[in-house]
A protein has these predicted regions:
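H-loop/switch region of ABC-family ATPase nucleotide-binding domains
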Residues: 77-78
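Conserved ABC ATPase "signature" region
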Residues: 1-12
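Conserved beta-strand-loop-alpha-helix hinge in the C-terminal portion
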Residues: 96-118
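Conserved catalytic motifs of ABC-family nucleotide-binding domains
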Residues: 37
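Conserved ABC ATPase signature
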Residues: 16-20, 24
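Catalytic Walker B motif of ABC-type/P-loop ATPase nucleotide-binding domains
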Residues: 41-44
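A short, surface-exposed alpha-helical micro-motif characterized by mixed small hydrophobic
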Residues: 83-85
Length: 126
């Protein structure tokens, strides 16, 4: 119950999992991962398949965990906007670590540009 309260979903207690929206389900799963409260939380594409409103609420919870519980959070994400907004440190990986540092430094690096854009044509790689 305390973990559901931490993620702002105390009202979901007792609800059937099948009746929850994608965002609600993600917050319930996050609450499950928070009991007992860990020092490190690992997340892999945590809002995949969740609508924009659910994603926003989920990341508000993540921000709260980081600020109020001083929790270390390692997250895999391909959403560069989320990475820019939430990450203290970014690690760019493509078979190996290509670059790490602050989001702005990584996003402006040649390694980043080479990973996402064809240097000849200036087009995004598929």
């Amino acid at each position: 119950e305390e973990a559901l309260e931490i993620v702002g979903s105390k009202d979901l207690k007792g609800r059937n999992l099948g009746s929850l929206s994608g965002g609600e389900l993600q917050r319930v799963m996050l609450a499950n991962a928070l009991y007992p409260l860990p020092e490190l939380l690992l997340l892999d594409e945590p809002v995949s398949g969740v609508d924009a409103a659910g994603s926003e609420k989920f990341y508000e919870v993540i921000r709260d965990l980081k600020q109020n519980y001083h929790m270390a959070i390692a997250m895999v994400s391909h959403d560069l906007g989320i990475v820019r907004d939430f990450a203290d440190k970014v690690v760019l990986i493509n078979k190996s670590v290509l670059k790490s540092g602050k989001a702005e430094d990584v996003f402006n690096s040649q390694e980043f540009k080479s990973s996402f854009y064809s240097l000849d044509e200036g087009e995004e790689k598929q």
